[in-house]
């Protein structure tokens, strides 16, 4: 798999069997736009737009609780957006400017499109991603 994200650090873990249970994209984004990752409305908008872009049907509204207030590195919003075929989850560290996002679905989706959209939405300077086909 090639990707359009410049300087992306990628790992691709492919199944050896022909049947797949699901597809999981795990992204660690660094040096994100701090205004975006610390804005609950923007994080919710990301989840809704991502669902549209990768053709996933959301199940309910995104949930965006604020967690980790006791530790500076973990303080920030978390995200869970259930989709009919699984979920989109994330955590956003305001102090480090990092975002950690997983997209898991039993329905195949365009991984590069999801990665590029996520990177652009959060304005990350650097991204490390892993893609796993689950058996």
State what each model feature region is.
Residues 1-135:
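Polybasic/polar functional segments that serve as interface/processing modules
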